[in-house]
Amino acid sequence: MLQYALVFFVIALIAAVFGFGGIAAGAVEIAKILFFIFLIVALVTAVMGLVRRR
């Protein structure tokens, strides 16, 4: 479960680089939205993984 959290976090970082760095000017808003979506999914997945281990 924590592997999924790491994957979603990496995807969020990639979306942040494209969205906040201005690399993809046409897709800035989409990349910003994807960053926050994948960041939330990564956090939820990490919490679920930690709760299941107990």
Swiss-Prot record:
It is found in: Cell membrane. The chain crosses the membrane at residues 5-25, 30-50. It is a multi-pass membrane protein. GO terms for cellular component: plasma membrane. InterPro entries: DUF1328. Keywords: Cell membrane, Membrane, Transmembrane, Transmembrane helix. The keyword Coiled coil does not apply. The keyword Membrane applies. Belongs to the UPF0391 family. This is UPF0391 membrane protein Reut_A0124. Pfam families: DUF1328.
